[in-house]
Structure formats: structure tokens, C-alpha cells
UniProtKB/Swiss-Prot annotation:
The lineage of its organism: Eukaryota, Viridiplantae, Streptophyta, Embryophyta, Tracheophyta. Its cofactor is Cu cation. This is L-ascorbate oxidase. Glycans are attached at N92, N325, N440. Belongs to the multicopper oxidase family. Gene3D superfamilies: Cupredoxins - blue copper proteins. The keyword Phosphoprotein does not apply. Cu cation 4 binds at H445, C507, H512, M517. The keyword Mitochondrion does not apply. GO terms for cellular component: extracellular region; plasmodesma.
Length: 552
């Protein structure tokens, strides 16, 4: 194994991701940020300097478990203090498992501003993947707004709320087109793009040779959009999800929610004199964003040769049965670790939209999360009892709660309590969706857990009840770090609390997290080793450091 050392500077820069100039948060002058590539077992050291003039910054390494380095998870107020302007912070962690991962900002809505990039982990030197391919294409999906994240944050925190609306553009590797379409020739209402190919918004072309197999790695770091990926005339063989191998299956398209990643294999066995569309459309919300497009270019064809037929049609946004059918097909590959048969503790988390003092919030069991100024990891390690609410949040919601009608209760409050687990405890979480403020409306939410992979034991419609127990899959449930709950439905997951630290578990939709849609899990914090001083140089832990510089 080796050490991969990166020196990064984060700063705002002018950029035109969708042919309209805007400001993006870039790294070393790049957008998206540089790709990290390592082998399982390697150490990754990122020397991160904050060149933003007036904002702190952190970077979360999404899907990396951070065993032994919970301070390097990159979640502001949970694992570390934000890095102040002008300061440098050293992230140092091991990448344990091969897979398709990514990194992104985790302070305010900085992910939305463009602070993200890919993190690819190959098998350890000398080991091979369990499937063969001739070449590889890496695709990072995101969504883009013309409105700045500052304006979005202020709007979400205002009364009445000003919602951010749907994104202007879907970006493929940071590239999209807003005022024009590369598929205009099939639709006279669309303005054709006049692109030479060198522009920052020119599509990222997938170049392939005929009669070969390619692995396409697809990760979604969208702020809001649930996406659907398809390639004209080509079947996709799904082989990996969130860095874990799955039982391979063929599909014409995949749904991908924010925080998820997949690998699919394609075989370039179509007519070699043609090129084919790659289309990424929006699902699960009423779309107001054109699909993101690029070409699968069969070499030696010219890139200017457009496919004979229009791009594949994205499935209807509200065809939830189709989404469920795809999601339910994902199971663990043969030989994957199986979940413990019994749980020690089961927590029910009810997802509701509520109004608190006229502000629209998201809440879990009637608590809307507002992070404290002292990072939990330091507060818990050094027993700072005043740093956050010592009363744990509720583990159940009222049995008679009606998930089919808008919430009527006025009990919702802002809070920052923590769910605490014993080391080795087997924890079940039942995520329960419900109606929003508006009649007959429930949304899809992707939930992401830091510091762990979990087994997805099952999904269902309506309210979870004891009868569902027998339907849970203990035989071959997939291991994931992100899982979706469908409208008016529930999702059951199981994980082992075996990674000392404090870990966020939250909706991966950026505005929803901003509005309080998350919880905090802690386990075995007393077993956490030395935490770099700089990670805790704020809030209550800073005072301890000043008073006792040797060891807070």
C-alpha cells in the first residue's frame, strides 16, 4: 500500500458549467474537483487550504468508512470544526474497500456550489475485480442552479420560505447545456448548440471501440434531483452499488438518487458506424429540467455524427412502481457478508415536514436538527456536557400517527440530541415516510449514513407493522451507504455500531438537510484515539485546548 498525497486549494472561480457564466467552488482551478484514485489499503492525505474569503469549508469523503479516523469524515460540527479562510487542514485516512465513491462539501449548501469530485478505489495491487472489462468511463452527476447558494440558503431560512425550485441543468462531469440542446435536430422547439468541443460546457463524450466491454462508474452528488441513466440501444449490467458488489442483473436504465453510486457494464455490440445517446433525466419530482445528454462515440466515427434516433425517453417522473421494481432487484453478490440474524435495538424515524414559528422545516420524530457550534466528536470525547442536548431524541413516533394526512401537531422543535449506541450493538432503523404540509404529497428521500455500510432489509408501502417482519430479507440484502424511502413508504436497514466516532445520518437532498432533515449517531467515542488539535479549534473544545494545551 502507498500514500497518495494531494495539495488542494478551494476557491470560487468564474465558470460556465452550462454555457452561462457563474461562480463555482473549484479545487486547484478545476471543476469538478480533481479525481482521487487509489488502491484499497492506501492512505490518502489531502492538504486542504481554504481560499474562500468569507466562509469556512470541510470535505466529506462519501462512502469511506474512516475506521480509526472519525475526525477526518469532513462533516462540519460533527467530526470537526470548519476550516477557516486562509487555514490549511490535513485529512489523512485509509481507503479500505474498492469501489466508486466521491467527495463533497459538507458545510451549509457548499456541495450545491460545485464543491465535489470523484474518488475511485481499485482493488489492492495484484487483486482483480470479479468481472472483466476492457475499459472504463467515470461519470459524476450533479444538478446546477443559476441562483447562488447564498440566496438559496437565505430563501430556505426565510418566512415565508422561498423554495429553490428545480435545477436549471443536469451536469455530466460538470458539463451541461442550458440555452441550447445537442439533440435539437429531433425537435424544432429546441435551439441547437454551436459548440466547438473545447468549451467548459461542451459535453463529456464517452469514446469506445466496437466489440468491447466497458465499466461505467456512475455517482450522483446532486443537491436535489433523482436521476435516471440510459444509453440508446444498450443494455446495462449492474455489478456494483455504493462500493459493494451486487448480484449482476440487466436493465435498460438505472435510477440513481443523490448519494448513490453504481457500476454498470456495457458491451459495444451495436452498429459500429453509428453513435448512441447517453441520457440522464429527472425522476421522483415534477421535472422542469431538460435531460443531461452526451454521446457514446463508437470510434473511429466522428463525434459530430449524431445518432439516427432521438435520445432514450426518461421514464415518467411519477412512475414509482417502476422505480421500486428497479430498487427491489438489487441484492448482494454471492459470498457477500450477511447481516446478523437478530437486532439489539430498533429505532423508528418518522420523516415529516413541519412549521416551527412560521419557518418551514423537516423533522425526524418531531425534532428538526440544528448543529451546535462545538463538534460532537470533541464534545463527547472530552465530556463537555453543555455542548449539546444531553437528552436523546425519541426512538419511536406515536403509533396512531396518520402518515396519509398533513401533520397537525405543534410539538415539533429544533434540537441537537444524539442517538448513542454501544460498541458492537446491532441496530435496526426503520425510516418511515409520511405526508408533507400539502395534501396528497409525499416525496422520495435518499438517506445516507456516515462511517458505515448497512444492509437494506426491505421496503414497503404505508406504515411499517409487525406483519412486515417476515418480509425482511436476511438472505442476501445489499450493503449500501445510501438508501431511498419512497413516498408514503418505509425502508428497513440494519448495521453494526462497530466504528467508534460520531456519524451523521441524513437526507442527502441538500435543501432538506439545511432544513433539519437529519440525525446524529454516536458509538464508542471513548475508544477514539488522538484527534488533531485543528479539528477541534472552535466552540467549547477550543476553550479546553487553550486551558490545557497538552490534552484537552
Amino acid at each position: 500500500s502507498q500514500i497518495r498525497h494531494y495539495k488542494w486549494e478551494v476557491e470560487y472561480m468564474f465558470w460556465a458549467p452550462n454555457c452561462n457564466e457563474n461562480i463555482v467552488m473549484g479545487i486547484n482551478g478545476q471543476f469538478p474537483g480533481p479525481t482521487i484514485r487509489a488502491n484499497a489499503g492506501d492512505s490518502v492525505v489531502v492538504e486542504l487550504t481554504n481560499k474562500l474569503h468569507t466562509e469556512g469549508v470541510v470535505i466529506h469523503w462519501h462512502g469511506i468508512l474512516q475506521r480509526g479516523t472519525p475526525w477526518a469524515d469532513g462533516t462540519a460540527s460533527i467530526s470537526q470544526c470548519a476550516i477557516n479562510p486562509g487555514e490549511t487542514f490535513f485529512y489523512n485516512f485509509t481507503v479500505d474497500n474498492p469501489g466508486t465513491f466521491f467527495y463533497h462539501g459538507h458545510l451549509g449548501m457548499q456541495r450545491s456550489a460545485g464543491l465535489y469530485g470523484s474518488l475511485i478505489v481499485d482493488p489492492p495491487q495484484g487483486k482483480k475485480e470479479p468481472f472483466h472489462y476492457d475499459g472504463e468511463i467515470n461519470l459524476l452527476l450533479s444538478d446546477w442552479w443559476h441562483q447562488s447558494i447564498h440566496k438559496q440558503e437565505v430563501g430556505l431560512s426565510s418566512k415565508p420560505i422561498r423554495w429553490i425550485g428545480e435545477p436549471q441543468t443536469i451536469l455530466l462531469n460538470g458539463r451541461g447545456q442550458f440555452d441550447c440542446s445537442i439533440a435539437a435536430k429531433y425537435d424544432s422547439n429546441l435551439e441547437p448548440c454551436k459548440l466547438k468541443g473545447s468549451e467548459s460546457c461542451a459535453p463529456y463524450i464517452f469514446h469506445v471501440s466496437p466489440k468491447k466491454t466497458y465499466r461505467i462508474r456512475i455517482a450522483s452528488t446532486t443537491a436535489l434531483a433523482a436521476l435516471n441513466f440510459a444509453i440508446g440501444n444498450h443494455q446495462l449490467l449492474v455489478v456494483e452499488a455504493d462500493g459493494n458488489y451486487v448480484q449482476p442483473f440487466y436493465t435498460s436504465d438505472i435510477d440513481i438518487y443523490s448519494g448513490e453510486s453504481y457500476s454498470v457494464l456495457i458491451t459495444t455490440d451495436q452498429n459500429p458506424s453509428e453513435n448512441y445517446w447517453v441520457s440522464v433525466g429527472t425522476r421522483a419530482r415534477h421535472p422542469n429540467t431538460p435531460p443531461g445528454l452526451t454521446l457514446l462515440n463508437y470510434l473511429p466515427n466522428s463525434v459530430s455524427k449524431l445518432p439516427t434516433s432521438p435520445p432514450p425517453q426518461t421514464p415518467a417522473w411519477d412512475d414509482f412502481d417502476r422505480s421500486k421494481n428497479f430498487t427491489y432487484r438489487i441484492t448482494a453478490a454471492m459470498g457477500s457478508p450477511k447481516p446478523p440474524v437478530k437486532f439489539n435495538r430498533r429505532i423508528f424515524l418518522l420523516n415529516t415536514q413541519n412549521v416551527i414559528n412560521g419557518y418551514v422545516k423537516w423533522a425526524i420524530n418531531d425534532v428538526s436538527l440544528a448543529l451546535p457550534p462545538t463538534p460532537y466528536l470533541g464534545a463527547m470525547k472530552y465530556n463537555l456536557l453543555h455542548a449539546f442536548d444531553q437528552n436523546p431524541p425519541p426512538e419511536v413516533f406515536p403509533e396512531d400517527y396518520d402518515i396519509d394526512t398533513p401533520p397537525t401537531n405543534e410539538k415539533t422543535r429544533i434540537g441537537n440530541g444524539v442517538y448513542q449506541f454501544k460498541i458492537g450493538e446491532v441496530v435496526d432503523v426503520i425510516l418511515q415516510n409520511a405526508n408533507m404540509m400539502k395534501e396528497n404529497l409525499s416525496e422520495t428521500h435518499p438517506w445516507h449514513l456516515h462511517g458505515h455500510d448497512f444492509w437494506v432489509l426491505g421496503y414497503g408501502d404505508g406504515k411499517f407493522s409487525a406483519e412486515e417482519e417476515s418480509s425482511l430479507n436476511l438472505k442476501n440484502p445489499p450493503l449500501r451507504n445510501t438508501v431511498v424511502i419512497f413516498p408514503y413508504g418505509w425502508t428497513a436497514i440494519r448495521f453494526v455500531a462497530d466504528n467508534p466516532g460520531v456519524w451523521a445520518f441524513h437526507c442527502h437532498i441538500e435543501p432538506h438537510l439545511h432544513m433539519g432533515m437529519g440525525v446524529v449517531f454516536a458509538e464508542g467515542v471513548e475508544k477514539v484515539g488522538r484527534i488533531p488539535t485543528k479539528a477541534l479549534a472552535c466552540g467549547g473544545t477550543a476553550k479546553s485546548l487553550i486551558n490545557n494545551p497538552k490534552n484537552p
